[in-house]
From Swiss-Prot:
Assembly: Component of a multi-subunit COQ enzyme complex.
Natural source organism: Plasmodium vivax (strain Salvador I)
Catalytic activity: a 4-hydroxy-3-methoxy-5-(all-trans-polyprenyl)benzoate + H(+) = a 2-methoxy-6-(all-trans-polyprenyl)phenol + CO2
Membrane association type: Peripheral membrane protein
Main location: mitochondrion
Protein name: Ubiquinone biosynthesis protein COQ4 homolog, mitochondrial
Cofactor(s) demanded: Zn(2+)
Source superkingdom: Eukaryota
Amino acid sequence: MHNFAKIFRSNFIDINAANKFEIFLKTILRIYKTPARTHLLAHAADISAIYAVRQIYNYMKNDEEGRTVLKEKPLLIRQDIQFNELKKLPKNTLGYKYMKFLETYKLHAHDREVSHFFTDLNYSYILTRYRQIHDIGHVVYNLNISIESEAALKLIELVQTKLPITLLAILVAPFMTPIYRFQYIFKDSLPSNFLSPNFDFTYTDAYNYVDELSIKQYEYNLTDYFHVEKRNDRNFYTKMYQHYFDNINNSSAVRGSIIYGFENKSSNDIIYDQPNREYIFLKNLKKKYLLFQYKPRKNLLRELYPWAYMAGVSTTKPLHSIHIEKWLDKDIDLFRRTYNISPLPDHLNLMAGIN
């Protein structure tokens, strides 16, 4: 309480309603062009949040844990939390996961913007608290910081807070989310030569995409390439196919051979190369990495938003009303069960989860 009272006094900006409206319009126009400047979003939230914050305050007053939070006004700042100690906690605690998230994405808990334009101490604290708890939301819902993951978390926050700025973020996010994304996923550490010109970018793809570059770059031996003239005798191709697998480790015995139209039941790919009017056999070598290709905007609209809405509705208490600081040394799964928090489904983890 004492810490926030000082923070409130040092950050309060006393301006009239007309000036606030002017700031709101200017920030809204600039947010789309510079979304990384989070203070713009914070200022717009400050000015537009009075009715929503009042409702949050009334909810917290009528909730035992919420009243405790309002009375003590805990903060995720260095003066109140020993962040280095959180890294020493067991790996499945909320505090450890929180620090791991911050370090993974190079974030700092104390960097969240303080509310500037509320004259009421409690209202100012509620909005400041909402911003500080935002990263806790990433952790407990298992969301990374991509545009689509941020948008999904904003939908959860809209359900829980009714803040207008969260609705704006949800509406704008699909236009800012990439249509298509290529992402290298490494099983181990990032190879030192990843950015070098001679790095072998072929991969084993979990979604069975064909690496188009590897079809063309014969000189780099990225794939085995096989050709035969087209024949109508199906038995010929059956024998050819068997011959290849009998000599799978002896490429000199099969190089210069191709299989046309034979049903492929292996983990390799047979595709039809339209320009050359021929079938190509691609030998997929096991790699320590894969190129993951997906459509973030489509995933956001069809999967992340529906999940986020249901996750927001099912949670029994908004995060800002929970005394998070008392849970930092507790098991994160226990925290989720206590408040019925549904983390990101496994099938969306590679696209939107914390990796």
